[in-house]
Amino acid sequence: MTSPWGHSADLARFYTVTEPQRHPRGYTVYKVTARVVSRRNPEDVQEIIVWRRYSDFKKLHRELWQIHRNAFRHSELFPPFAKGTVFGRFDKTVIEERRQCAEDLLQFSANIPALYNSRQLQDFFKGGVISDGSELIGPAEAYPDSPANAFPECGTEGFSSDSDLLSLTVDADSLAEVDDGMASRQGSPSRTFGLSLSTDSSAVGAVASDSEPSRVEDRESRSLFPSSLKPRLGRRDYLEKAGELIKLALKKEEEDDYEAASDFYRKGVDLLLEGVQGESSPTRREAVKRRTAEYLMRAESICSLRAAPQLHTGPQPPGSLSSRPPWSLRSPAEELKAFRVLGVIDKVLLVMDTRTEQTFILKGLRKSSECSRNRKTIIPRCVPNMVCLHTYIISEESVFLVLQRAEGGKLWSYISKFLNRSSQESLDIKEGRPSMPPRVCLQQPSASPQGGSSFESRGSDTGSMLKALPLKTSLTPSSQDDSNQEDDGQPSSPKWLDSGSSSEDECTAGYLTLCNEYGQEKMDLVSLSEESVMQPEGDKADTQAVSSPASLATGSVSPSTHLRVFSGGEDLEAVSSPPTSESLSRSKNSPMEFFRIDSKDSTSELLGLDFGEKLHSLKPEPLKALFTLEDGDSPSQSLDPGESKRESEAQDSVSRGSDDSVPVISFKEAAAEAISGAEEGRPDLLVNLPGELQPTKEASAMDPKFSQASAGRLDSKLLEAPDVLCLRLSSEQCHGLGPEGPEELSDPTEFCPGGVIPEHDAQADPGVLFEAAVDHRSSPDQFLFSSLRSESDRLGQVEVVVTAQALQESLFHISSPCSGANKEHSAYADTATSEEVLLFTEPTKEEANSLFQRGSEAQERGVGAGEADKEIHQIFEDLDKRLAASSRFFIPEGCIQRWAAEMVVALDALHREGIVCRDLNPNNILLNDGGHIQLTYFSRWSEVEDSCDSDAVARMYCAPEVGAVTEETEACDWWSLGAVLFELLTGKTLVECHPAGINTHTTLNMPGCVSEEARSLIQQLLQFNPMERLGAGVAGVEDIKSHPFFTPVDWAELTR
């Protein structure tokens, strides 16, 4: 277009009405923008901006309506206009209606030459500010924000400020996009229309052609603007190419690929410097120079950021610099091929790096569909008492974190015994079973040669040994969110104790298929009630089956410790086991927890918080022959079949009373089943099979032989849930018990391979759990756990009925017959003195003698069922008393003080990084191999949506302001710390003591054993108002560190 006149097909007109504002004189004005684009050369753009009020629009509507009616005689097609109102004219709805009507009117006139060429329309835009198209990609000058101001030379918005460009949280759109010179009919008043640097000119032409009127006018028409649209034949497309490179640089920067981002910045700068040489417009030339300088500064800052990790070899203190992800931690997605999956731990994977053979935890964070550009990515690297990040891998859909594995497991797995919680202990018994009475004891952990992992030792001891895998306990069975947050270093247990949900929903199809096949086969209940006593085929009169008793309510066993069953000095032979299908057919439905590594965290409903209530509610059947002992050595005594049926019913009420009390399927049998069914396409089990030591040939020479049927009955017994209340009775109870048996209890050292068993080995205490995972060469560790043993010595022993059935149906259910009459009474001595950890202990020799003596006297007097019931009632009363006494035992405050200080140091470091945990709960608190606190890994990613654990909120581990309208500050984590410490000090959760919640006037309920310093700390941390919470003041975390509760703590040592 070289003249102001041209055909209507050569120009496209677009109008927008935006930014309604109040004029200083009291009325509302609207910003009207008109743009004319050449269809032949879309780069030729002219723009005019005016500010008009409602009365101006109404006048223009009346004039254009008159012209349209005279020209076309179809006034009904003309768009209507909003009617004027006196009241409510400043309402948002009224203003928006007027703005939309004005925009529709102008856009309607853009398609009719008689209207857009009219004098009335040109008078409407008279006095506006005209901008040539060359300035649309020019300096970042803002439009006038008020009609009362003088109209300066208008440009388009580019960067909002220099600080936006240099900020780590820079918005890519603000860097790469400018005014696009186009407007749509349905544009929002607050929408900014811009022409991107990478906008294709063909796209602009397409938009213009779409708005071309269907009826082309042949007559000439005047241009809307007084000046012509001058062609810019010398302009090149270097701005578009440079814009594409800058966008790629921003994208790589968001992905933390700083090397590629720096290269794209440099290429874009080179292109801008070449193109600006021939630029005729001085305004655009200045704009390009300013942009070039900004891109160069950005490229230099990226180079310095990449070089920063190499300059500082030592660990950096927490802060903004350490939060920036170093280039060395970033790994390409192909790195995932180097990791081999060893197992599934709840929502994370236990993997091994095949290059270094080290084990790690692999956690995946799925990217959200809408990433928040305002949220900065923070990757902490130097946070004490938190698991370390080895590397991270970013793919198209997820962010994978390769994390350090916390060797000690979860803290709550160790302290659950002190908090009156006992988790279900299920042992995987092997097919090979020794013939001597086994002994259960704890063994210290062995050092692992591999960095970052410690597997259970598989070394051999003197004599044959049967190793059983203890299932680690926890307050929470595995199933959960996230987790928030879920967890990084160890199995995360999202669901809480009273949650009835199973983790089957989270398992893969392979696991579900395997379990469904096992679950289709039911246990034959009739065969269990009619079983006879398992005896060797040799000398039957001189042997009997016994079982090592364990405590009636044990807690979790340390993952770094394991149980060993020691046998005597005689040679042994493995018992022949029934076919795998036969043993599996006797099993019930097993939940997925028994096929996953994190099954160690499953809990037992029978031994849960309401254990004392269940003891009262269970009503045993009348058992007449409970203490009836046979005179002589013949073990032929048996019970009446009717009573055996009732006993089976009583047994069933315990072993099948809850969904959690289910049998354990042997991992070895499951593996054999999977191998035999490989042709059917059954998936392999992703678990680590517990270790087993096969008996040597020499040890198997003198072992008595067992029949196949006897071994099958033993296997079915082992597959059942443990009869912890000793309610399961059969003919085996009274078999082989002479009246002289209790008096001849011998020293348990007879069965130890070394000949001597120390007293502390025979009777474990709660301190063993902590000492097993502590390096005794470190004095702080000894201080941390030494007080637990002395506290546990105050617990008394519980009188338990020592019958053959009580021994055989113990919690761990490890059974084997004696081999020889000379070993018969020694078996009782061994099993009576050996014990597992916590709440209940085995009876002493004198207690066992008195109990059996009462049974013998009852038989001689012909005591009936009423006297037998009385004996059981007394036993349960004594159990209740002992349980109440043990419930008064708490964790020493010295241990809690150390753990709390380590958590304070970790939270303070995270806060300095800019991370607020919000939902810190017991699932996030782990232990390292030295027994010190390690939190799960907390980070923040711009592409991953932050989430809060709903169960943690319901359990009051989260502050009241979490999820509310108030701001979530660092004080949220201090509330979580108070909730955790409350549970450690009192033995009960906060929601149990305060089910109605905590408000501004709530007084916390804490037992008298809690010190005044601890009470004060908890009371100040659990303040409803976050501003009044300890640690939320001006001094911050220093207020917490200076609290009297932490007086003995050396903070300088903890922060090293």
Swiss-Prot record:
Binding site for ATP: 795-803, 823
Bias kind Polar residues: ranges: 473-482, 544-561
Cited PROSITE patterns: PROTEIN_KINASE_DOM, PX
EC numbers, comma separated: 2.7.11.1
Pfam family, one: PX
Annotated spans, Disordered: 204-223, 426-504, 529-588, 628-662
Domain (Protein kinase) ranges: 343-444, 789-1046
Record key words, sorted: ATP-binding, Cytoplasm, Endosome, Kinase, Lipid-binding, Membrane, Nucleotide-binding, Phosphoprotein, Repeat, Serine/threonine-protein kinase, Transferase
Record field: catalytic activity: L-seryl-[protein] + ATP = O-phospho-L-seryl-[protein] + ADP + H(+); L-threonyl-[protein] + ATP = O-phospho-L-threonyl-[protein] + ADP + H(+)
Main location, first listed in the record: cytoplasm
Record domain MIT: where: 276-304
Domain PX: 8-132
Compartments it resides in: Cytoplasm; Membrane; Early endosome
Active-site residues, record numbering mapped to chain: 919 (proton acceptor)
CDD domains: MIT_SNX15 (cd02677), PX_RPK118_like (cd07287), STKc_RPK118_like (cd05576)
Family indicated by similarity: Belongs to the protein kinase superfamily. Ser/Thr protein kinase family. S6 kinase subfamily.
Subunit structure comment from the entry: Interacts with SPHK1 and phosphatidylinositol 3-phosphate. Interacts (via PX domain) with PRDX3.
Protein name: Ribosomal protein S6 kinase delta-1
